[in-house]
């Protein structure tokens, strides 16, 4: 137990170390921060009824993610980007003891500690705990739902109403954090009920089912209010998203790609290995060394298990895998590492099935490879995390080409530290009322937001007004030795200041030039807020 406690403390350290400085702040995070800052300053009425958009669609998710961010902002009385990432950090940390409790439903205490310890130090779990994004807490809420759901069928638990309430709340929150959980969790639940239909009357009467549904409706109340006000606009977007999500590839191509990406990402979760080339080897190793053996053993244990509750644990593990694998087939060409956040604990569960099988064989010789494999998983993830931290630290000194920052498309090493150093420089350098800035679309909003936190009035350089005095700065990647700006020829570069991977160029319009004829139009939000609701 002491070793497990030490592992958990190490996992917390790896999630929280340099949390402020090394926080990822991109376009989505700045957009969300601006919304929460507005709510913190103006009151609860400015909380939105819907959450962020589901990637690549016009569908808005539920607002749970924003409400968690607002709670953090209210408690700390700050809309600083690090504060808004605290909920994701907290839920990532809490998922460790939760996974331990979940594992104890089937495994011994010792095996539960081993597997939860390996999960705690998973590189991908650490990386996604260190910034704010709506999918990041999926692993916690999926686990919480499965744990509460199993407790409803656990004969040793007397007070089941609380677990029905928790199951309903966690189901609702998880389905609001990512579109795919909205599709998979209902499927898993319904199929589980079909296999357990004989025990439903015993453990779930109609009153308990209504309580479960009532908790879901409660969390979805803002979404329902929005649909009433907008006459079902988001529902229309939901059906449009279902039609648009599938790719234009054939079914066979999608299945092959699904197998490949599942294998590659499974291998990534277990080992932290990131191949520089698009190799099939990690996928092959994952499928034949981990996924297929784990799935077959889960089925074998299910057939042999006499304890009805443990059978349910194994059934849920199998359904967890099958539901996500099958639902990912139509979108297999769009799969990214973040799609594995709802399943982040599952590879370690499968490792547990394999390790348990060999460990319980009569010959002790099998225990040696089991220990060796578990050690490789542990060391691999720790080393992968070390290399990632090394990349971020290097980006504070020079332009870099990161390999391990697999969070978003932009792999440039830019973190909050770069923006804050740039803001400090601009505040010292500029003595004028306005700061005109230019940056790529990925960093336009983050730059403005961080400058606003430093009490500077930042506007797009494209909104330059000849009659208003201001300072001009363009932001670019140090490695590219360039910056994003239309009509560059109409500006003189006065100086440039490097902050590791980020370079800030001080500009000045050439005399007699009018750089822009039209300003940058601010996008008008179509969001509905609680202040807009009139009963």
Residue ranges and their predicted role:
Residues 9, 86-107, 144, 148, ...:
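Transmembrane-helix motifs of polytopic, lipid-linked glycan transferases
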Residues 14-18, 30-60, 64-67, 71-75, ...:
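Extracytosolic helix-loop segments that constitute the early lumenal/periplasmic catalytic or substrate-binding loops
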Residues 33-45, 67-68, 173, 182-304, ...:
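Transmembrane-lumen/periplasm boundary regions of multi-pass, lipid-linked membrane glycan transferases
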Residues 85, 124-135:
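Short acidic/glycine- and proline-prone juxtamembrane loop motifs at membrane-interface regions
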Residues 89, 128-129, 138, 183, ...:
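Hydrophobic/aromatic-rich transmembrane helices and adjacent perimembrane loops
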Residues 105-110, 145-164, 174:
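Membrane-interface transmembrane helices that cradle and orient dolichyl/undecaprenyl
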Residues 163-178, 190, 217-218, 325:
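Membrane-interface alpha helices of multi-pass inner-membrane proteins
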Residues 367-429, 438-454, 534:
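Membrane-proximal, lumen/periplasm-facing interface regions of secretory-pathway glyco-
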């Amino acid at each position: 137990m002491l070793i497990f406690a030490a592992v958990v403390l190490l996992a917390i350290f790896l999630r929280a170390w340099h949390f402020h400085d090394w926080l990822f702040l991109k376009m989505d995070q700045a957009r969300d921060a601006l919304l929460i800052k507005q709510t913190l300053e103006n009151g609860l009425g400015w909380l939105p009824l819907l959450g962020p958009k589901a990637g690549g669609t016009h569908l808005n998710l539920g607002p749970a993610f924003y409400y968690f961010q607002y709670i953090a902002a209210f408690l700390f009385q700050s809309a600083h980007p690090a504060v808004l990432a605290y909920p994701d950090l907290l839920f990532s940390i809490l998922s460790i003891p939760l996974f331990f409790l979940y594992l104890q439903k089937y495994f011994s205490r010792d095996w539960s500690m081993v597997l939860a310890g390996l999960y705690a130090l998973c590189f991908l779990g650490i990386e996604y705990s260190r910034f704010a994004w709506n999918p990041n807490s999926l692993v916690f809420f999926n686990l919480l739902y499965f744990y509460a759901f199993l407790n409803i069928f656990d004969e040793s638990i007397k007070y089941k109403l609380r677990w029905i309430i928790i199951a309903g709340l966690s189901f609702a929150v998880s389905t609001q954090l990512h579109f795919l959980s909205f599709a998979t969790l209902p499927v898993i639940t319904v199929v589980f009920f079909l296999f357990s239909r004989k025990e439903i009357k015993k453990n779930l009467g109609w009153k308990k089912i209504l309580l479960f549904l009532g908790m879901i409706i409660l969390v979805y109340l803002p979404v329902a209010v929005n649909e009433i006000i907008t006459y079902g606009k988001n529902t229309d977007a939901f059906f449009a998203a279902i039609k648009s999500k599938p790719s234009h590839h054939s079914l066979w191509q999608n299945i092959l790609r699904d197998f490949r990406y599942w294998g590659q990402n499974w291998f990534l979760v277990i080992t932290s290995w990131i191949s520089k080339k698009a190799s099939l080897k990690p996928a092959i190793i994952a499928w034949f060394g981990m996924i297929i053996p784990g799935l077959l053993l889960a089925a074998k244990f299910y057939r042999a298990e006499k304890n009805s509750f443990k059978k349910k644990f194994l059934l849920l593990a199998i359904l967890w895998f099958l539901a996500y694998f099958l639902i990912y087939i139509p979108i297999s060409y769009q799969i990214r590492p973040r799609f594995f956040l709802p399943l982040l604990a599952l590879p370690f569960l499968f490792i547990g099935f394999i390790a348990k099988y060999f460990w319980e064989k009569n010959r002790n010789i099998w225990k040696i490879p089991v220990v060796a494999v578990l050690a490789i998983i542990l060391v691999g993830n720790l080393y992968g995390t070390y290399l990632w931290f090394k990349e971020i630290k290097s980006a504070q000194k020079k332009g870099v080409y990161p390999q391990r920052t697999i969070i978003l498309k932009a792999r440039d090493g830019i973190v909050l530290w770069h923006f804050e150093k740039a803001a400090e420089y601009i505040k010292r350098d500029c003595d004028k009322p306005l700061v005109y800035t230019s940056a790529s679309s990925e960093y336009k909003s983050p730059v403005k937001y961080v400058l606003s936190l430093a009490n500077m009035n930042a506007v797009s350089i494209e909104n330059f007004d000849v009659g208003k005095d201001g300072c001009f700065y363009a932001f670019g990647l140090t490695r590219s030795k360039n910056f994003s700006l239309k009509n560059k020829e109409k500006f003189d570069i006065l100086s440039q200041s490097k902050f590791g991977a980020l370079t800030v160029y001080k500009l000045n319009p050439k005399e007699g030039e009018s750089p822009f004829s039209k300003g940058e139009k601010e996008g008008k939000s179509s969001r509905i807020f609680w202040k807009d609701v009139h009963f």
